[in-house]
Amino acid sequence: MSFLIAPTLPTPASAASFDCERTDLAADEKAICDTRVLNDADVKMATTFDILTSLLAMGTRDALRDEQSAWLKKRQACGGDVACLTAAYEARMKQLTQAFEGLSRPL
């Protein structure tokens, strides 16, 4: 008897930066969990944010966290509108990328 074992790949339910299995998902979170492109954008943005916060000094880190909280409110305002959510992630990634580029500039 032989068995075929498939590698375990992250599924949309487990890949987002939040638990897609929760029963109390907001409309924006549900759209992110249900849309692979948004799910991937969420993971990329959350990972970038985590790395960036680990590289910043405390005051700057706190400011970045405040910006992230404000951005999350904007994302929530999109509700389940995939186009709005896509634009929100693109804009936030641009901001985070610019912050990274600022770190690499010589003093």
Tell where the protein language model's regions lie, with residue ranges.
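Bacterial N-terminal signal peptides
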Residues: 1-8
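N-terminal alpha-helical modules
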Residues: 9-107
